[in-house]
């Protein structure tokens, strides 16, 4: 039976991948778990343990071949794949996400943006035209949609998620400050948490 990979491990794989990318660009051919750990500020035993979920990568004494490990991680976390993304809510956050070119560079293609407010329908945001949320069924029939960004007010969030789940969405990046009830993977984004964490570090003089 396949080992269940804990969510925190999956999250860290993305960090490892970015770190390896940088190491590779710096021309570092082999890397020890200690080096990855130091760069990311975590324990090297943690790095070794996380990577061991996916089989034996490194060689004792030599470490990991940077490029090979990067390629293996690409396969595991699906970086080689393009993901189709839609944004629900064409307000401040939704518009910013739909306009963000960096996502496409990371292979997350925003292919649609939807809103319930008719006055926003037809507006151009980046390369996209805002569609009414009632057009979502039709959109799913014509497109493969894997990820949705939820940028609607708190009170609309659950209703939107229920609909997206019914249509077969695979995962959600949620900006609404609410715990969603769903069986699909959700990544909550909370900017206030970053501020709280920063103020905590400042107060305790932590770098
Ligand atoms: N996570 C964070 O760090 C963070 C930061 C700021 C705001 N937020 C949250 O993100 C969400 C969006 O914030 P914003 O500033 O972009 O709000 P906004 O009011 O600018 O935009 C929300 C949009 O959602 C649309 N909408 C409402 N109900 C809808 C529905 N049922 N279907 C489709 N569209 C619908 C509205 O018409 C509006 O255009 C809010 O829940 C807000 O609390 C989160």
Swiss-Prot record:
- Give a GO cellular-component term: cytoplasm
- List the GO molecular function terms: DNA binding; DNA-binding transcription factor activity
Gene3D superfamilies given in the database record = NAD(P)-binding Rossmann-like Domain, Winged helix-like DNA-binding domain superfamily/Winged helix DNA-binding domain
Q: Extract one GO BP annotation from the record.
A: response to redox state
Q: Where does NAD(+) bind?
A: 89-94
Major location category of this protein: cytoplasm
Is Nucleotidyltransferase given among the entry's keywords? no
- Taxonomy, superkingdom: Bacteria
DNA-binding region(s) from the entry: 15-54
User: Which InterPro entries does the entry link to?
Assistant: CoA-bd (IPR003781), NAD(P)-bd_dom_sf (IPR036291), Rex_DNA-bd_C_dom (IPR009718), Tscrpt_rep_Rex (IPR022876), WH-like_DNA-bd_sf (IPR036388), WH_DNA-bd_sf (IPR036390)
Is Metal-binding among this UniProt entry's keywords? no
Its keywords, alphabetically, are: Cytoplasm, DNA-binding, NAD, Repressor, Transcription, Transcription regulation
Compartments where located: Cytoplasm
Description of how the protein assembles with itself and partners: Homodimer.
- Which family, according to UniProt? Belongs to the transcriptional regulatory Rex family.
Q: What does this protein do?
A: Modulates transcription in response to changes in cellular NADH/NAD(+) redox state.
What is the protein name given in its UniProt record? Redox-sensing transcriptional repressor Rex
From which organism does this entry originate? Answer: Thermosipho africanus (strain TCF52B)
Q: Which gene encodes it?
A: rex
